[in-house]
């Protein structure tokens, strides 16, 4: 049987909370014969922030990708750096998350340049919330020696 553990955005919005859920997952994995499947949401506020910036683009307002990324980039990287203790694992996690953040910045800059938000581009932008939180949790689990999750 499979056990699905779902964690919302509030559960992953700080390093301490990420460590708490990683320990819950580790305990469940250790104490259960079930396969554990973990689902994490975007960090609290990320989806709203993406909707906000795309709404501004749709309304023809001048949008600063740089200001958006000044908020998003350090927030995600700070959580990661404070949740993971193993330097090697942290460096791998930083690489993955930084690449995603760079991609987010580039996609957003392109949308601003075109001054057009299509349903497809909005969906793609919104996917970054989960795509950023997932490796943070995954590498935190690796930090706890759960490398196959």
Protein language model features and the residues they cover:
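Nucleotide/pyrophosphate-binding catalytic subdomain
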Residues: 1-147
């Amino acid at each position: 049987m499979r056990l699905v553990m779902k964690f919302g955005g509030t559960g992953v919005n700080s390093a301490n909370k990420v460590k708490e859920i990683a320990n819950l997952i580790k305990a469940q994995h250790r104490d259960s014969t079930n396969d554990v499947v973990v689902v994490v949401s975007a960090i609290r506020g990320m989806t709203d922030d993406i909707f906000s910036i795309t709404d501004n683009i749709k309304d023809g307002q001048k949008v600063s990708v740089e200001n958006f990324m000044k908020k998003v980039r350090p927030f995600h990287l700070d959580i990661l750096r404070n949740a993971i203790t193993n330097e090697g694992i942290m460096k791998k996690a930083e690489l993955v998350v930084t690449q995603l953040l760079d991609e987010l910045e580039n996609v957003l800059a392109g949308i601003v340049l075109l001054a057009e938000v299509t349903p497809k581009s909005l969906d793609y932008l919104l996917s970054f919330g989960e795509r950023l939180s997932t490796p943070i949790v995954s590498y935190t689990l690796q930090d706890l020696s759960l490398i196959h999750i």
